[in-house]
Amino acid sequence: MKNRLACSAVGLVALFAASSIMIAQTSQPRRNGGQSSATGQSSIAPASPGGEIEGTGNQMPRYKYPAAPGPAPKQDLSGEWGGPLSAPRIDPVPPLTAWGQAQFAAHKSNQRISVANSNDPLDTCDPLGFPRNALWESRGIAFAKMPDKVVELFQYQRVWREIWTDGRALPKNIDSDLPDSADSRYYGYSVGHWDGDYNFVVDTAGLDEDTWLDNAGHPHSSELRVNESYKRVDQHTMEMTVTLNDPKVYTKPWMAGQTTYKWIPQQQFDEQLCVPSHMQDYMKLIAKPSAGAAGK
């Protein structure tokens, strides 16, 4: 096993270095590893004449393609996509309802307090769920097309979700006492269809209220509906747009992410996992003693 915690001096130095990185990563929303501009607009790095792509976000490595991209294949997102290419464009978070404000206050984000006193599910390696894993902890994604569904896989935490394309409807009753009630789930229930040949549209419902929307602790209810659009621009480029609608928590729908992914030439992801035992060691040896010394 790599990266085991060591009690030697070298191990402790490495651990302190790692802790500084972790603290820096939790100091602001990790929106896909990119940096937002002053206007909130995304900054897309263009392709060079030789087909070289370099993203501005730290999750996007430099890719070199043998030739300029060809046309997008029809009704097909299959394969592995790197990105996001840059910081996503987002709308301002709308005002919260009274219920939403109470939930937000109960979420102790490590953006406002020390990591040791936070109740962010990420700090205990609990499932991030959807849409947080897709929007605010996104690295690479992949799609696999099957006869009755599309499976989306996430590089971070190595998890996947089913997007049904067989015409079924989303469950209407979530966590209720009705006979047709469906249990809420970390990744909800998703159905998809093609709007033309190059735009895959996905609707998701039934999301577990225990998950957060982002690293700042914004909440959602089981009434949340998520709409996604994956537009295949060309052979190497895909644009994603995500809109949230949760009238129990927010006063209006809002566009929570719009960003660009690039086809990965080598079609291979690195493994990125949150390891509970590593996090427990970090909390015990670094986070909690540091919080005590700081008095918070």
Describe each region flagged by the PLM.
Residues 5, 9, 21-296:
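PEST-like low-complexity, intrinsically disordered acidic/proline/serine-rich tracts
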Residues 11-16:
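Classic N-terminal secretory signal peptides
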